[in-house]
Amino acid sequence: MLDLTTYRALFADHELRRIVLASVAPRLPIGMNALGLTLLVQSQSGSFAHAGLVSAAYMGALAVQAPVIGRVVDQNGPRGVMLPLGMLHALALLLLTLAVTQRAPLAVVLVSAFAAGIVFPPISMTIRAMYRKSDMNDALKQSAFAVEAAIMEGCFIIGPLLVSLTMLAASPAFAVLAAALLASVGTWHFARSGALVRWGRVEYVAQRHWLGPLQSFGVRRALLLSLCLSMGIGLNEITLPAFANASGYPARVGWFYAAMSVPSAIMGVAYGSWRLRWPLNRQIMLSGLWLAGGSLLMAASTQTWAFMLGCALTGLAFGPMMTALSLQLGKLAPSEYSTEAFTWSTTLFMIGLGVGFWAGGMMIERHGIATTLVACSALMTIAALCCLLVPEVRGTAQPEGA
């Protein structure tokens, strides 16, 4: 089931190992803030709707800045933006925490959340573009993207657990402050790891199209698919803190995230070693249908153990789906727009998560957790069927005679 040969070949590169390890800490705030901001605002305002709105503002800002930063990086390289954005993001998180704890008006909190998201450092997009531009063969690239997906899942495992620990010890505010520290120190370490050099040279073209990668029909459809799937993920994930809160043990939310993320990371790594014949859009379709079924199982759960089991079974599809989405976009995007293409992916994914969190928060307060998960299942089913509209590409080259 799991062939480690390509992973051994991948990490025989000592510099790449250092870069990958250095990329973890500055990305932990993604996993921490998605939950930490929700719990921090909810603890101060008593409203999941307000909490979902603030999280949506933060994620929306991540979405807005991503293509702009991506185009800057494609045209000038990542050196000039990485460290300044890391420091500004840490400062913005400090100001956001102050605004929430001092019970500032909702408008001020929303502006603060947007400001924090608008200056997030481009760690993930730099890593993915580095893989896309490298001279690695298709098998190594699939494993590299699988590692990338597993790291992101790891951030969503460790991040919520750190938030849960701070809730046991003190307040969700401490989780956001810890995220600020990780953003500043982690970005500095990542910038010194060799990643900015390894990213390569800027690929100059005679005339860059103003739409960048969006001029490609296949890229546009792949990105819209990512948007739909991320909306479903947002609807699903907002139910985790809501279920924990309804059970009377809010700190359990970290265990729900872990129950979902650990199987996701394991399956993501396993998927990276597989050489499947199916086109990537059909692999993504299968993952979407699995997530739809898992959401229905979670909706039917009333006991904590059953909900955790539903989270675990649902999570099995997340890792493979995220890896396949990255591979699909990497195959469809023109090489000179590789960083910008991945930033558009980040943009629409964050918009979808934000919309899902916002809509889910409203639905939970008005209709309950189960209804929200049923809506998630319906959306995932529609998104899965839309996979067939994306041009077919394969993750790895098939051997002759296959």
Enumerate the predicted regions with their spans.
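Loop-to-transmembrane helix entry/capping segments in MFS-fold secondary transporters
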Residues: F48-A49, D138-E148, P250-A251, S335-S345
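Helix-to-loop junctions at the C-terminal end of transmembrane segments
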Residues: V64-P78, M167, M267-L280, I364
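A late C-terminal transmembrane helix in Major Facilitator Superfamily
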Residues: E336-H367, C376
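C-terminal ends and interior cores of transmembrane alpha-helices
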Residues: M87-R103, W290-T302
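Intracellular juxtamembrane helix-capping segments at the cytosolic ends
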Residues: L37, P121-D135, L240, P320-A333
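Cytoplasmic helix-loop-helix junction between adjacent transmembrane helices
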Residues: S112-G154
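Helix-loop boundary and gating motifs at the non-cytosolic
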Residues: L2-A63, P213-A258
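C-terminal transmembrane helical hairpin of 12-TM major facilitator-type secondary transporters
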Residues: N281-L325
